[in-house]
C-alpha cells in the first residue's frame, strides 16, 4: 500500500492548498482523519457564494460563524458573493466583512447581486482605515463617507463597480491610497457621484466604464496621474473630461462621445467654444501616447471636431487600432496626418448606409516613411469603398512590409481570390510588401 505523502505535509502547506479548493471540496476533507477534521477551518482564505448553499441560509450562517470563531489569525483572501435581499441573513454580511477586515485581511472581494437600491448594504467603515488591505474589489454595495481620514497605506489594487457613493467618498478613497497602482471604476446606474477626480502619483493602470442610460450635463471627470501607463476610458455620459500630467501614458483604449449625441444632427457647432476646448485639451493631454485603440463613436466626434478645430499631433504613436465605417473614411488621411511616426495600423471596417464621398488625395507623412504593417478587418468582396481603402494603402505606402485583409464573406472562391490578388499586386508601391488574405 502506497504512503500517504499528502498527509505528511505540514499543516501550513495543507492549509495553503485547501485555500484553492472550492469551499465544499475543502469541507469534505474533514472526514479523511482526525488530523484533517479542522484543517479547512484554518485556511488563510475563503471564497464563498451564498448560492452554493441551501436556500434557508442556515448552513451558510453556521459555516461562516464557525470559520471566524476558529480562524482568528490574519486572513489573506476573503471573497464573498451574496444577495443583500436575503432577509434571513441581511444583518450578518456587513459584520462578517468588518470582522475579516479587523483581522488583517489582505485581499477583499465583495459582490452583491440582484440588489434593488433600497436593499443595498453599506460597507463597514473600517475598510477605509485598513493597514493590511492590498487589493479591494466591491460590486453593487454602498460606501459612506467615514468620520475619519481615509488611510489605506498598503492598497495597490482597487475595483469599484456599481457603487452607491456618498459625496466625496470616491475622491477620499483614491487620495487615501499612497501606493495605489491599479484602479477600476465601473458605473452602470445613477448615483450621487457627479464629479470624479482621480489624483494619484503612483497610479499605473486606470479603467473607467460609465454607461448609464440617461444623458446629462452634470457629470465631470478629472484625471491627474503623472505615472499612468495604461488607461481604458469608456464613458458615454460625462460632459466635461479633463486630463493632466499624462506624459507617461503608453497605451489608451478610448471610447467616449464627450456627451455629444449625433442622432438628431451634430450639436458640435463652431460657436460651441466650451465643448471645442474640452475636446482639444483632452486630445492634447493624451498626445504623448504610443499605443491607441479608438472606437467609432470617438472617431465621429473627432471628425466633427476637425471641421471646427485643429487636431493635435501624436508624435509618439506607433500602434493604432481604430473602428472606421465607410462614412468616416473621409477622416482617415487627416487622422493619419497627426500620427507622423505610425508603424502599425489595424482598421476594423464597416459599411455605412450612406457613405460620404471619399477623397484620398492627401498623402500623410507616415505612409511615406514609417507605416510598415496594416491590417484591415471585416471587408466585403466587391464593396467599392473597401476596395478604395485597400488601394489607398497599397499605392501610397512606400515602406509597407505586410498588408493583411480579412473578409466577412470568406471563404472566397479560388477565382475571386486570384482576381483580388491580381488587383493588389498590380498597384503596390512597396515592392517588398507581402499581401495576406484571410
Swiss-Prot record:
Domain FBD: 355-407
Extent of the LRR repeats: 246-275, 286-310
InterPro entries given in the database record: F-box-like_dom_sf, F-box_AtFBL13-like, F-box_dom, FBD, FBL13/AtMIF1-like, LRR_dom_sf, LRR_FXL15/At3g58940/PEG3-like
F-box domain: residues covered: 3-49
Pfam families: F-box, FBD, LRR_At5g56370
Entry keywords, A to Z: Leucine-rich repeat, Repeat
Organism superkingdom: Eukaryota
PANTHER family: F-BOX/RNI SUPERFAMILY PROTEIN-RELATED, PROTEIN WITH RNI-LIKE_FBD-LIKE DOMAIN
The name this protein goes by in its record: Putative F-box/FBD/LRR-repeat protein At5g44950
Amino acid at each position: 500500500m502506497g504512503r500517504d505523502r499528502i498527509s505528511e505535509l505540514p499543516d501550513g502547506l495543507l492549509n495553503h492548498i485547501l485555500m484553492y479548493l472550492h469551499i465544499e471540496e475543502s469541507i469534505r476533507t474533514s472526514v479523511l482523519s482526525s488530523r484533517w477534521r479542522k484543517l479547512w477551518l484554518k485556511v488563510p482564505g475563503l471564497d464563498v457564494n451564498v448560492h452554493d448553499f441551501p436556500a434557508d441560509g442556515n448552513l451558510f450562517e453556521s459555516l461562516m460563524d464557525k470559520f471566524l470563531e476558529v480562524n482568528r489569525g490574519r486572513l489573506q483572501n476573503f471573497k464573498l458573493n451574496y444577495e443583500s435581499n436575503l432577509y434571513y441573513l441581511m444583518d450578518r454580511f456587513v459584520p462578517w466583512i468588518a470582522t475579516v477586515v479587523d483581522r488583517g485581511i489582505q485581499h477583499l472581494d465583495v459582490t452583491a447581486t440582484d440588489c434593488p437600491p433600497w436593499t443595498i448594504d453599506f460597507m463597514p467603515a473600517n475598510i477605509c482605515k485598513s493597514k493590511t488591505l492590498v487589493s479591494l474589489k466591491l460590486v453593487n454595495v454602498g460606501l459612506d463617507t467615514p468620520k475619519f481620514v481615509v488611510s489605506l497605506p498598503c492598497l495597490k489594487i482597487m475595483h469599484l463597480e456599481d457603487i452607491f457613493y456618498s459625496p466625496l467618498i470616491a475622491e477620499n478613497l483614491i487620495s487615501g491610497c499612497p501606493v495605489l497602482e491599479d484602479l477600476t471604476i465601473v458605473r452602470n446606474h445613477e448615483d450621487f457621484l457627479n464629479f470624479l477626480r482621480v489624483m494619484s502619483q503612483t497610479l499605473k493602470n486606470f479603467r473607467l466604464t460609465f454607461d448609464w442610460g440617461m444623458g446629462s450635463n452634470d457629470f465631470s471627470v478629472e484625471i491627474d496621474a503623472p505615472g499612468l501607463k495604461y488607461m481604458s476610458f469608456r464613458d458615454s455620459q460625462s460632459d466635461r473630461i479633463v486630463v493632466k500630467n499624462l506624459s507617461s501614458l503608453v497605451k489608451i483604449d478610448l471610447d467616449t462621445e464627450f456627451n455629444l449625441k449625433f442622432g438628431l444632427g451634430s450639436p458640435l457647432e463652431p460657436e460651441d467654444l466650451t465643448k471645442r476646448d474640452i475636446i482639444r485639451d483632452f486630445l492634447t493631454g493624451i498626445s504623448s501616447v504610443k499605443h491607441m485603440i479608438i472606437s467609432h463613436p470617438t472617431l465621429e466626434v473627432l471628425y466633427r471636431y476637425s471641421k471646427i478645430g485643429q487636431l493635435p499631433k501624436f508624435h509618439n504613436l506607433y500602434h493604432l487600432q481604430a473602428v472606421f465605417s465607410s462614412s468616416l473614411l473621409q477622416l482617415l488621411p487627416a487622422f493619419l496626418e497627426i500620427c507622423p511616426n505610425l508603424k502599425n495600423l489595424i482598421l476594423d471596417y464597416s459599411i455605412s448606409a450612406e457613405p460620404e464621398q471619399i477623397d484620398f488625395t492627401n498623402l500623410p507623412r507616415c505612409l511615406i516613411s514609417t507605416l510598415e504593417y496594416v491590417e484591415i478587418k471585416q471587408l466585403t468582396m466587391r464593396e467599392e469603398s473597401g476596395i478604395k481603402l485597400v488601394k489607398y494603402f497599397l499605392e501610397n505606402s512606400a515602406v509597407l512590409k505586410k498588408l493583411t485583409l480579412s473578409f466577412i464573406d470568406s471563404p472566397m472562391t479560388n477565382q475571386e481570390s486570384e482576381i483580388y490578388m491580381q488587383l493588389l499586386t498590380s498597384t503596390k508601391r512597396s515592392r517588398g510588401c507581402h499581401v495576406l488574405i484571410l
